[in-house]
């Protein structure tokens, strides 16, 4: 067995190599003057079982194309089996047609991964697990809840775990149960044209004097977390921490979250966070346990 580290790994390939005691080969990659990607696998992999690590955070389209190129090259070079470890799977939120005529982007991406020869697909915290049914091979879903719960307990003595919508409640419950913390949820709705988020429903929860941790799968523009943070403080919260498995933080999201009083940000290395102000958890151990 061999690990192939792609063009975007955030160190997960190196960590897996150490955890699993498997040799690591890094792909050679560069960008041509016209913007196209060059990929080369600089090692013999014939008859090998290959673990390919490639996340697809920003720039998503570049990293996806390189994932497809690397995967098919691995099969062309005679690998016996190919497992693609894609810690963050881009386009996962476009899993249906919200408006007539829209592309179902995740469907296309998963079809391509099937066609280029991926036998097993490993994804960390997909937006909706059922969307992965478009992939034709074996699926493995990684939930790094234990690592996140442990980090929360390390920095907050008595946390209250809050899901920013009903869909995130199961995640919040599992993390809360790991550390015997109370939990609840609020309900939001999003305008599909403007993207604006507003609170639709808030159960009768007591947050007075609580250190609240809002946990979601993805924090992108931060609109949902901004609204949830305002609500938490209006209900008497002492502090608010925002945590996500995939901490994208696009378009000034970090600054917006700080402005409304988010004290601490927690993410993982599924995304290239590269910010010393953000607590970043390595999900490699959770991935290794799934293999």
Swiss-Prot record:
GO molecular function: ATP binding; kinase activity; magnesium ion binding; ribose phosphate diphosphokinase activity
Cofactor: Mg(2+)
Residues bound to ATP: 34-36, 93-94
Active-site residues per Swiss-Prot or TrEMBL entry: 188
Assembly description: Homodimer.
SMART domains recorded: Pribosyltran_N
Pathway(s): Metabolic intermediate biosynthesis; 5-phospho-alpha-D-ribose 1-diphosphate biosynthesis; 5-phospho-alpha-D-ribose 1-diphosphate from D-ribose 5-phosphate (route I): step 1/1
Function noted in UniProt: Involved in the biosynthesis of the central metabolite phospho-alpha-D-ribosyl-1-pyrophosphate (PRPP) via the transfer of pyrophosphoryl group from ATP to 1-hydroxyl of ribose-5-phosphate (Rib-5-P).
UniProt remark on cofactor binding: Binds 2 Mg(2+) ions per subunit.
One Pfam family of this chain: Pribosyltran
Gene expressing this chain: prs
GO CC terms: cytoplasm; ribose phosphate diphosphokinase complex
Binding residues for D-ribose 5-phosphate: 190, 216, 220-224
GO BP annotation list: 5-phosphoribose 1-diphosphate biosynthetic process; purine nucleotide biosynthetic process
Record protein name field: Ribose-phosphate pyrophosphokinase
UniProt keyword Zinc, yes or no: no
